[in-house]
Amino acid sequence: MSKSKHAVELCSLLVDDIYGELSSRIFTILLRRGRLPMNALKRHTQLTTRQLKLGLTVLVRQNLVYHNSEGSDTHYEANIDAAYALVRSGKILEIAEERFGSVAAEIMGQLVLLGHAKISDIIAELNKNHEPHANGNSNETNGATNGNGVHSYPSGQLNHTLIQLLEEGFIQPVGQNMFRSPTDSYNAVEKALLQDSYGGATRGTKQKDELRMRIRGQLQELRAQVPNWKPVGYNRSSTNGHTNDIASKRRRLSHSGGATNGYDFGDDESSKLDGNLVLRINHEKCTVFMRNRRLVELANSRIGVTTSYIYAELLRLMAEQIPRCRPDPRIDDAVDDADGPSIIITTQELTDALSKTINVSTGIGKATSQKIDTSRLDKLQNGRKRKAQDEAEVEGVASSDEESEDDHKPFTNGNGHAMDVDEDDPFSDQPGANTSKRAVTFKDRDRTPPPTESRQARMMHVMSHLQLLAADDCQLLRKCGARQMGEWTVDFERVIDRLRESELDSIIYENFGQIGHRLVRVMRKMGKLEEKHIAKLALIKQQDSRTTLVNMQMHGMVDIQEVPRDTGRMIVRTIHLWFCDEDRVTSLLLDRTYKAMSRCLQRLDVEKRRKANIIALSERTDVQGQEEAFLRPEQMNQLREIRAKEEDLLGQICRLDELVGIFQDY
């Protein structure tokens, strides 16, 4: 995350809102001043040593500040990525609840509040929060509460949920190296290798490359040095949930009893976790889950619900081998071949892992062969294949995207068309828009259980859905082999690039209208162009295009380059080329997004200050849950008003966070 002015302001507001003014003051100084020792930090913050230690304790516990001891001095450095991750706490809890139920959400919530904590402390806090209160809200009889009260969770259930969260990567054990910044770790490893193996300095390019490779290897070992959380004799459970709405609903409904998904929460000593094990939230892995959810929403909107369920399960299988969205260039090895899939899922593996509650025969258009036009699809696939072959010939390697003739079987989407394609206008503002009525009747909403079908037929239906995903314009999937009825992979960089391009087009369309959208698409495809050529290609009057281009330049969406025809550099002998630098536009939009999020937080703080008395009254323990009985009608109206404003502002922050994820993190 960049340390721009608005990004620093946003992270400072987040820390201040959750952890108070003292922690926010220290964190802001570290963000603006950089890495500082205790004496310099004391001088800039004008705080006492005791106040600094209290604030740093909170920040270090939340991993908001790195620390590294060099001799007698300890240097502190702000972790801006962990500060921004506070925005996504609600999304992380929501995903955990969808996957594993309310117990997992409460465990994750405790880790959000505590930062890192021992398992015994987490269990104690959960049981403490679920103790019955003698305030009239619950009646305790023989050590149990009634249906309106609260209850404590069995230790076996909490242990099983913790194991599930550890298996999927939502949480991770805390290692000693996690408290040191990546820069300090790199410098320490480099210094040790230089002194031990190279006499203090390297000589020549060969030794520099060798040193770089050895540093990368040791950094990978340091990152993998985390405490082993698996008990002796532990076996991975086979009760992992499926990422679909049906399984999630069944899982949540079953939490009222003593078992979940048929699992008996007994005190199994062979799989009991160590109570002294320290855990924290793995934000890098949680970002992978948020990216998967965004891609599933994209597949749902472009193709259909059933296909999105299958795509979600495929992404879940791939996520088991993806520790983070963006690799660290100083630690992770670079991929030489961009088309070389590192993670492959076969149709057979996906079918076996798919939940039986999903009727895979629905969501696929059923039309006669006479009504299916596959010419456009064949043309697109042949074009992709030729492009891949040309790139492979240039690089001197064979293309990995070759497919057999059996792969070009006719398949359609729900509207009876082979795929969404542009019309004759190459710069249409709404490509692939089809407003005609559906020609096929679906049974997606049929609540009857799916009919029994053979395994081969189910695999064929799954393969049809995968072919729909592969044929989509967003390239949601790519076929890379024919083993076990097809091998599939996801080129995340390409998919996110298309998603980023779509979001950018939407923003430009909303702010500059149809003409601005067409002009940007022309410049994106053709590159730098003169004004008259842009107007000609976009089929727009030159006067209209000039007005829109100037307006977009004032807002930073496009830029202009002056190219003189001769050395005289006269204005009449100068060519003005318009272009759209998407990297610059993305950086500009990110900065404006951070500014909008910080303004939302500031507005929320102002609204809460205005209604501070009502909020304090509603937060009393004897009033919570019974506001209507204790508050007057005018007080209830004020409370509803402030809660509605809070919901609107926080919802806007979450929507803006989606843009940050698309443009930067995914």
Swiss-Prot record:
Region Disordered, annotated ranges: 130-153, 375-455
UniProt cross-references to Pfam families, sorted A to Z: HTH_9 (PF08221), POLR3C_WHD (PF22536), RNA_pol_Rpc82 (PF05645)
UniProt keyword list: DNA-directed RNA polymerase, Nucleus, Transcription, Zinc
InterPro entries reported for this sequence: POLR3C_WHD, RNA_pol_III_RPC82-rel_HTH, RNA_pol_III_Rpc82_C, RPC3, WH-like_DNA-bd_sf
Leader sequence residues: none
Family: Belongs to the RNA polymerase beta chain family.
Protein name stated in the entry: DNA-directed RNA polymerase III subunit rpc3
Species whose genome carries this gene: Botryotinia fuckeliana (strain B05.10)
Underlying gene: rpc82
